[in-house]
Amino acid sequence: MFFERPDAGETAVLVHVDFQDEQEREDAGEFLELVRSAGAEPATLLTGSRKRPDSRTFVGSGKLEELREAKAVHQAELVIFNHALSPSQERNLERELKCRVIDRTGLILDIFAQRARTHEGKLQVELAQLEYMSTRLVRGWTHLERQKGGIGLRGPGETQLETDRRLLRARIKAIHKRLDKVRSQRSQNRRARSRAEIPSVSLVGYTNAGKSTLFNALTTAEVYAADQLFATLDPTLRRVEIEDVGPVVLADTVGFIRHLPHKLVEAFRATLQEAAEASLLVHVIDAADPDRELNVDQVEGVLEEIGARDLPTLKVMNKIDLLDSAPRIERDGEGRPEVVWVSAQQGKGLELLAQALSECLADDIIDLELALAPEQGKLRAGLHELNAVREERFDEAGHSLLTVRLPRRDFLQLMARLGERADDYLPTTLQEKPVWEA
């Protein structure tokens, strides 16, 4: 990794500003958790209020002087802002304060770098870091030369900075190629599971909502779970048995956070695609968090960004032990499970969650008897490609008589791809049954 991270125990002065024009403000408490997760030691938190950021140093001259004094009093080596800084603001602040300055994006990137355990996760974090740093490259990064052999690589008349920028671009391009291979392999794996009719369930949620604890409780897997932000970064897949459904692939994905940097969403697209193509999303929510509604909005915003906003979703209100609340299932107007209240830590309500998962996934499977004319060969081929055909025979007129079983979502996607109306093939009872909504 090519990123200057806070050293363990490094003393930091923190800055949090409320802007009057902002509808959605950062959370100072969450900011402190982020700083501690990165390994820095918060010395003091300076707060303030402004109409808008100062274009040169983000804060005004008075707050800048406060920062100088706080840095001197606490002998801080680092200043961390709970906001996104422009490259020029970051440079100007470093000149004024004579120390390193990190913004919220850099802080989150650092935590991701520490949490990445697999080769894929490390590549994705490195890509996000390099793209973030490409706009902040103002001094020689001679260690990049070692990636390419060093001497003899500089073009005629190139400065060290120009050389480093070129090497940085080359490294970014190389990582993109490697991640393209990862995406391709993941896509092949998902297609194989689809052909084998194995539904997939992805756990999503705000960071520290308890996804990994719930994942462990459902699978008896040993996924790292801790009371800290971004304890899980790399996706973990496990096969579990769900009553009335059979084998199901359960995926634990990276936690989301307020104002998750766009570059991270892009870099982790291969990982997040597990959620985007799931048969069912399980949105894990910290029921005891006073900001839970805001957190739900943030998660749904990221899901929309990766094209997963409209997938079938079951909400799980976790940590009910902190509310002294009882496990239960809440259902929608048509009797389908909508919300399950559980405590993954104490194992309460897990049998209700298993029941809800069974209902949700069994509800998604459809059985059809189809008679297809010879000119409907594309539809017949598509159903065979999905491994959905259980029996096929032909009548005297040459029609293909198919017995079909497949996830309803796969059938609707096939119909959309072929430009056909799904209702023309579905029984009336299935036509009236709407596609699951989040």
Language-model regions, residue ranges each:
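Conserved beta-strand segments of the P-loop GTPase G domain that flank and frequently precede/overlap
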Residues: 14-18, 45-48, 80-82, 283-286, ...
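Short alpha-helix plus adjacent loop in nuclease-associated cores
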Residues: 106-125
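Conserved C-terminal guanine-recognition region of P-loop GTPase G domains, centered on the G4
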Residues: 26-36, 41, 64-73, 83-99, ...
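Flexible beta-alpha connector loops of hexameric P-loop NTPases
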Residues: 18-23, 52-57, 115-120, 159-160, ...
